[in-house]
Amino acid sequence: MTRRLPTATAARPPSAGSHFKTLKHESLASTYITPIDREDIHALAIELDDIADLTNQAARACEMMGVERPSHAMMGLLDVLVATTAELVGAVAKLRSRDYPGIFAAKARIRTLEKQGDRVHRDAVSRLFLTGEIDVKVLLRERIVLDDIETAVDHCEIVADTLSNLAVKHG
Protein backbone atom coordinates (compact mmCIF):
# COMPACT_ATOMS: atom_id res chain seq x y z
CA MET A 1 0.00 0.00 0.00
CA THR A 2 1.44 3.36 -0.98
CA ARG A 3 0.95 6.30 1.32
CA ARG A 4 0.55 9.81 0.02
CA LEU A 5 1.91 12.83 1.80
CA PRO A 6 -0.88 14.60 3.67
CA THR A 7 -0.09 18.01 2.15
CA ALA A 8 -3.66 19.23 2.21
CA THR A 9 -4.18 18.29 5.84
CA ALA A 10 -0.71 19.23 7.04
CA ALA A 11 -0.86 22.72 5.59
CA ARG A 12 -2.47 24.97 8.11
CA PRO A 13 -4.06 28.26 7.14
CA PRO A 14 -1.93 31.34 7.82
CA SER A 15 -4.48 32.58 10.34
CA ALA A 16 -4.25 29.48 12.57
CA GLY A 17 -0.87 30.47 14.01
CA SER A 18 -2.00 34.05 14.42
CA HIS A 19 -5.17 32.87 16.16
CA PHE A 20 -3.10 30.72 18.56
CA LYS A 21 -0.81 33.67 19.34
CA THR A 22 -3.79 35.97 19.93
CA LEU A 23 -5.38 33.46 22.32
CA LYS A 24 -2.07 33.07 24.15
CA HIS A 25 -1.66 36.82 24.55
CA GLU A 26 -5.26 37.28 25.72
CA SER A 27 -4.95 34.39 28.17
CA LEU A 28 -1.69 35.69 29.63
CA ALA A 29 -3.08 39.21 29.90
CA SER A 30 -6.25 38.07 31.68
CA THR A 31 -4.59 35.63 34.10
CA TYR A 32 -3.34 37.32 37.24
CA ILE A 33 -1.35 34.38 38.60
CA THR A 34 0.30 31.76 36.41
CA PRO A 35 2.08 28.62 37.64
CA ILE A 36 5.22 29.67 35.76
CA ASP A 37 6.49 33.06 34.60
CA ARG A 38 4.58 34.70 31.79
CA GLU A 39 7.81 35.21 29.87
CA ASP A 40 8.53 31.48 30.06
CA ILE A 41 5.03 30.61 28.85
CA HIS A 42 5.41 33.08 26.00
CA ALA A 43 8.82 31.69 24.97
CA LEU A 44 7.53 28.10 25.10
CA ALA A 45 4.47 28.98 23.02
CA ILE A 46 6.66 30.63 20.38
CA GLU A 47 8.91 27.56 20.20
CA LEU A 48 5.94 25.21 19.90
CA ASP A 49 4.52 27.39 17.13
CA ASP A 50 7.89 27.20 15.38
CA ILE A 51 7.57 23.40 15.21
CA ALA A 52 4.17 23.78 13.55
CA ASP A 53 5.64 26.33 11.12
CA LEU A 54 8.58 24.06 10.25
CA THR A 55 6.29 21.08 9.71
CA ASN A 56 4.08 23.22 7.51
CA GLN A 57 7.15 24.33 5.58
CA ALA A 58 8.00 20.70 4.81
CA ALA A 59 4.43 20.06 3.64
CA ARG A 60 4.51 23.17 1.44
CA ALA A 61 7.83 22.05 -0.06
CA CYS A 62 6.27 18.68 -0.96
CA GLU A 63 3.31 20.38 -2.56
CA MET A 64 5.42 22.99 -4.37
CA MET A 65 7.84 20.41 -5.77
CA GLY A 66 5.21 17.87 -6.72
CA VAL A 67 6.01 15.09 -4.25
CA GLU A 68 3.07 12.75 -4.69
CA ARG A 69 4.35 9.85 -2.60
CA PRO A 70 6.86 10.10 0.20
CA SER A 71 10.10 8.21 -0.17
CA HIS A 72 11.05 5.57 2.37
CA ALA A 73 13.47 8.06 3.97
CA MET A 74 10.79 10.76 4.17
CA MET A 75 8.43 8.31 5.87
CA GLY A 76 11.16 7.34 8.32
CA LEU A 77 11.76 10.97 9.25
CA LEU A 78 8.04 11.70 9.44
CA ASP A 79 7.62 8.76 11.82
CA VAL A 80 10.37 10.24 14.02
CA LEU A 81 8.68 13.67 13.89
CA VAL A 82 5.33 12.19 14.90
CA ALA A 83 6.90 10.27 17.81
CA THR A 84 8.87 13.32 18.93
CA THR A 85 5.87 15.64 18.89
CA ALA A 86 3.84 13.04 20.81
CA GLU A 87 6.56 13.05 23.48
CA LEU A 88 6.40 16.85 23.58
CA VAL A 89 2.64 16.80 24.11
CA GLY A 90 3.17 14.54 27.11
CA ALA A 91 6.03 16.67 28.42
CA VAL A 92 3.96 19.86 28.26
CA ALA A 93 1.19 18.10 30.21
CA LYS A 94 3.80 17.09 32.81
CA LEU A 95 4.81 20.74 33.17
CA ARG A 96 1.23 21.63 34.01
CA SER A 97 1.02 18.84 36.62
CA ARG A 98 4.53 19.69 37.90
CA ASP A 99 5.84 16.21 37.14
CA TYR A 100 9.41 17.42 36.71
CA PRO A 101 11.06 13.96 36.72
CA GLY A 102 8.64 13.03 33.93
CA ILE A 103 9.83 16.05 31.93
CA PHE A 104 13.46 14.95 32.29
CA ALA A 105 12.54 11.42 31.15
CA ALA A 106 10.64 12.82 28.15
CA LYS A 107 13.63 15.01 27.28
CA ALA A 108 15.87 11.92 27.22
CA ARG A 109 13.42 10.08 24.94
CA ILE A 110 13.17 13.11 22.65
CA ARG A 111 16.95 13.33 22.45
CA THR A 112 17.11 9.64 21.49
CA LEU A 113 14.47 10.19 18.81
CA GLU A 114 16.30 13.26 17.50
CA LYS A 115 19.51 11.24 17.17
CA GLN A 116 17.53 8.55 15.33
CA GLY A 117 16.25 11.29 12.99
CA ASP A 118 19.83 12.45 12.42
CA ARG A 119 20.83 8.91 11.39
CA VAL A 120 17.86 8.53 9.04
CA HIS A 121 18.62 11.93 7.48
CA ARG A 122 22.35 11.24 7.09
CA ASP A 123 21.78 7.81 5.58
CA ALA A 124 19.14 9.13 3.18
CA VAL A 125 21.27 12.04 1.97
CA SER A 126 24.26 9.75 1.58
CA ARG A 127 22.19 7.29 -0.49
CA LEU A 128 20.98 10.14 -2.69
CA PHE A 129 24.52 11.13 -3.60
CA LEU A 130 25.91 7.60 -3.86
CA THR A 131 23.12 6.34 -6.08
CA GLY A 132 24.21 6.05 -9.69
CA GLU A 133 21.83 7.48 -12.26
CA ILE A 134 19.54 9.88 -10.39
CA ASP A 135 17.70 12.83 -11.85
CA VAL A 136 19.03 16.08 -10.40
CA LYS A 137 15.46 17.31 -9.80
CA VAL A 138 14.68 14.23 -7.74
CA LEU A 139 17.92 14.65 -5.79
CA LEU A 140 17.18 18.31 -4.99
CA ARG A 141 13.54 17.64 -4.15
CA GLU A 142 14.41 14.79 -1.79
CA ARG A 143 17.21 16.74 -0.15
CA ILE A 144 15.07 19.84 0.46
CA VAL A 145 12.14 17.90 1.93
CA LEU A 146 14.41 15.72 4.09
CA ASP A 147 16.19 18.83 5.39
CA ASP A 148 12.87 20.53 6.23
CA ILE A 149 11.58 17.52 8.16
CA GLU A 150 14.92 17.13 9.97
CA THR A 151 14.83 20.80 10.98
CA ALA A 152 11.40 20.28 12.56
CA VAL A 153 12.70 17.23 14.47
CA ASP A 154 15.73 19.23 15.63
CA HIS A 155 13.47 21.98 16.92
CA CYS A 156 11.57 19.44 19.02
CA GLU A 157 14.78 18.83 20.95
CA ILE A 158 15.15 22.59 21.49
CA VAL A 159 11.64 22.68 22.97
CA ALA A 160 12.50 19.69 25.18
CA ASP A 161 15.53 21.64 26.46
CA THR A 162 13.27 24.60 27.24
CA LEU A 163 10.86 22.36 29.15
CA SER A 164 13.77 20.85 31.05
CA ASN A 165 15.05 24.32 31.94
CA LEU A 166 11.59 25.25 33.21
CA ALA A 167 11.52 22.09 35.33
CA VAL A 168 14.86 23.05 36.89
CA LYS A 169 13.72 26.63 37.44
CA HIS A 170 10.38 25.76 39.04
CA GLY A 171 11.14 22.35 40.54
PLM feature segments, named:
Residues 1-171:
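Cytosolic, long alpha-helical scaffolding segments
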